[in-house]
């Protein structure tokens, strides 16, 4: 371990694979960010950003946004599709449409919308009335594309139609049969020609956590017979020319490229058939599904993807192009709604470790000669560990069984508290000793080695709410890369489990990227008694903010944008303070003014003097105006 360096930590945390070239660990052991791919040497030290924010009065937890990463991801997506179009000889265009449901924060939408000079090639997608109104106000350029998905009522459809009068190109995607009649009615009433799209239910579907959002059992989309009925309805009204867009969606976070290949082939057949039936389809929207490799394993795990961005683009472009060449059809504009791939990398949640409980060897002596038999048995097992060829698995099983018997006898009143405590400490010592003796390379030892690694890991209490900031980690077991921000030039000799500050046993991180796999504990260096430890949760820019809930009334964290200036230096802008206690109380209809009145009445008790009364009221006011998370005094 004496030759350990930051390069070793890079491998342990698998940073080169999930970091997409944005994240690194420098020689001093600090995590860095290179947000602008055109300036790879311009690096930001995350610890420096946190220190600068602290000097300005902001404590952790804080969400750091890197708008330059958003721009880099937009460029990467356009470059991948541009190269695929050029290599394949595809005659249509590519249009990137950002579905704002992935992250509706105003600054995120603005950064994405403004990040490409050729604005008509970058559109927005809405899935509800509030999202549509937001999208209509964000796009200012003539001809900006807006795709309208989701369930729709007449008001939604009217807003979409009126968007065309504002100069936008608004596609209303019919996702259930009843929507067509509403579109026809409202367009006739407003005398606005609609741009209609249709979402096809494919037989193909992606595997993984979100597979139910695609395929024939999806809650959205039209079956083959329903699409035929839609075409005949439009043909009968002389409005078949309004049907301009074909849409499908395999599901979010598609891990296996073969699922994408199958979906594209099936979509291509739908395109060919719709053209054969007279529909003037100009746009094929392949939806979302472009995966993010959260683990860095390049695998078919639901938190990974076994393909690159360029491979995805090649499969989409070549797949649609092959159908067009086979049937001599015009090459449609290709739209992808790759929101997760655009936004995931740009945000990092940073928080501090407020305390830790480690598992260490206990200094205990042999039981007295007249001690109960069960304690004598446990001590014998402990001594057996020092024999020439100990049976490690048997010793562990016996120790677990003996401890169970101790707890039973304690409950029955046969053992006292001191004896129970002695047994617990001896069992802990046995586990620690076994952990050092087990060989993980030995297949027979591997399961127990993993069990003890988790059992003996440090409990690290992190100043954040898993339910607010990483809801997918709790709800669906999503893996997010996490690592300390400093000290990584030192050997990672400890294992930890991160626990949040909510009053819920589910509030802990259960999965950690470790090498080319995922483990149940986090590798960590040893920190000094007065050395502060900050940890970063990476790739949290997609879905997490909007899905977060208010468990224990922990609300939004502080947020700040971290830019690179013209000289490649860190420039922190657009700082937004997190929710205060009084704001959170209002969310659940608790009026802070009523709390103040009740406090006034309670402290008016004659037993309290004026100074004490004032101190209590001042403390209340500080609490109401303060950050919901733990703060240093």
UniProtKB/Swiss-Prot annotation:
Modified residues annotated as N6-(pyridoxal phosphate)lysine in this record: 101
Residue sites binding substrate per the record: 284-294
Names of required cofactors: Mg(2+); pyridoxal 5'-phosphate
Pathway recorded for this protein: Amine and polyamine biosynthesis; agmatine biosynthesis; agmatine from L-arginine: step 1/1
Catalytic activity, as annotated: L-arginine + H(+) = agmatine + CO2
Domain of life per record: Bacteria
Keywords linked to the UniProt accession: Decarboxylase, Lyase, Magnesium, Metal-binding, Polyamine biosynthesis, Pyridoxal phosphate, Spermidine biosynthesis
EC number: 4.1.1.19
A biological process term (GO) from this entry: spermidine biosynthetic process
Similarity remark: Belongs to the Orn/Lys/Arg decarboxylase class-II family. SpeA subfamily.
PANTHER family assigned to the protein according to its UniProt record, in alphabetical order: ARGININE DECARBOXYLASE, BIOSYNTHETIC ARGININE DECARBOXYLASE
Alphabetized NCBIfam families for the sequence: PRK05354.1 (NF003763), speA (TIGR01273)
The protein's role, per its UniProt record: Catalyzes the biosynthesis of agmatine from arginine.
Name listed for the protein in its UniProt record: Biosynthetic arginine decarboxylase
Organism in which the protein naturally occurs: Aeromonas hydrophila subsp. hydrophila (strain ATCC 7966 / DSM 30187 / BCRC 13018 / CCUG 14551 / JCM 1027 / KCTC 2358 / NCIMB 9240 / NCTC 8049)
Primary gene name: speA
């Amino acid at each position: 371990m004496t030759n350990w360096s930051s390069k070793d930590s890079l491998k342990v945390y698998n940073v080169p694979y999930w970091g997409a070239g944005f994240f690194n660990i420098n020689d001093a052991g600090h995590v860095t960010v290179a947000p602008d791919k055109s300036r790879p040497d311009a690096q930001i030290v995350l610890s420096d950003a946190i220190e600068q924010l602290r000097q300005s009065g902001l404590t952790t937890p804080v969400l750091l946004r890197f708008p330059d990463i958003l721009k880099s991801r937009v460029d990467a997506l356009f470059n991948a599709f541009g190269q695929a179009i050029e290599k394949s000889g595809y005659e249509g265009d590519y249009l990137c449409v950002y579905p704002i449901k992935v992250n509706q924060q105003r600054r995120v939408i603005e950064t994405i919308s403004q990040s490409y000079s050729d604005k008509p090639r970058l559109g927005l997608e809405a899935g509800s009335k509030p999202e549509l109104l937001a999208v209509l106000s964000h796009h200012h350029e003539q001809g900006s594309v807006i795709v309208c998905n989701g369930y729709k009522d007449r008001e939604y459809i009217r807003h979409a139609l009126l968007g065309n009068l504002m100069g936008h190109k608004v596609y209303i995607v019919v996702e259930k049969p009843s929507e067509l009649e509403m579109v026809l009615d409202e367009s006739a009433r407003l005398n606005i020609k609609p741009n209609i799209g249709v979402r096809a239910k494919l037989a193909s579907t992606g595997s993984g956590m979100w597979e139910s959002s695609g395929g024939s059992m999806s809650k959205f989309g039209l079956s083959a017979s329903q699409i035929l009925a839609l075409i005949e309805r439009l043909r009968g009204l002389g409005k078949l020319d309004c049907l301009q867009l074909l849409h499908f969606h395999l599901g979010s976070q598609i891990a296996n490229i073969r699922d994408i290949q199958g979906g594209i082939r099936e979509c291509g057949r739908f395109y060919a058939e719709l053209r054969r039936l007279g529909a003037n389809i100009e746009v094929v929207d392949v939806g979302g599904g472009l995966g993010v490799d959260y683990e860095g394993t390049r695998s078919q795990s639901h938190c990974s993807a076994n393909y690159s961005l360029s491979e995805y683009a090649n499969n989409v472009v070549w797949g649609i192009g092959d159908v067009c060449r086979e049937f001599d059809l015009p090459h449609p504009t290709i739209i992808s709604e790759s929101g997760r791939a655009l936004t995931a990398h740009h945000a990092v949640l940073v928080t501090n470790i407020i305390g830790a409980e480690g598992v260490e060897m206990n200094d205990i002596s042999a039981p007295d000669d007249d001690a109960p038999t069960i304690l004598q048995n446990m001590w014998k097992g402990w001594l057996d560990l020092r024999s020439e060829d100990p049976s490690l698995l048997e010793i562990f099983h016996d120790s677990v069984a003996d401890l169970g018997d101790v707890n039973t006898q304690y409950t029955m009143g046969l053992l006292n508290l001191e004896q129970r405590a002695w047994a617990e400490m001896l069992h802990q010592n046995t586990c620690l000793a076994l952990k050092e003796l087990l060989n993980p390379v030995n297949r027979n030892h591997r399961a127990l080695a993993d069990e003890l690694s988790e059992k003996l890991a440090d409990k690290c209490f992190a100043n954040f709410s898993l339910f607010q900031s990483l809801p997918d980690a709790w709800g669906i077991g999503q893996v997010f890369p996490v690592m300390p921000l400093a000290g990584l030039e030192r050997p990672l000799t400890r294992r930890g489990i991160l626990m949040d500050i909510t009053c819920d046993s589910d509030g802990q991180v259960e999965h950690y990227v470790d090498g080319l796999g995922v483990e149940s504990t986090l590798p960590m260096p040893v920190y000094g008694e007065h050395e502060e430890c900050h940890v970063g949760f990476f790739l949290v820019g997609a879905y997490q903010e909007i899905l977060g809930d208010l468990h224990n009334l922990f609300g939004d964290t502080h947020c700040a944008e971290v830019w690179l200036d013209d000289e490649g230096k860190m420039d922190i802008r657009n700082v937004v303070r997190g929710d205060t206690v009084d704001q959170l109380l209002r969310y659940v209809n608790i009026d802070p003014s009523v709390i103040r009145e009740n406090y006034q009445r309670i402290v008016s008790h004659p037993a309290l003097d004026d100074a004490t009364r004032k101190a209590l009221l001042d403390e209340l006011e500080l609490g109401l105006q303060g950050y919901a998370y733990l703060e240093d005094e």
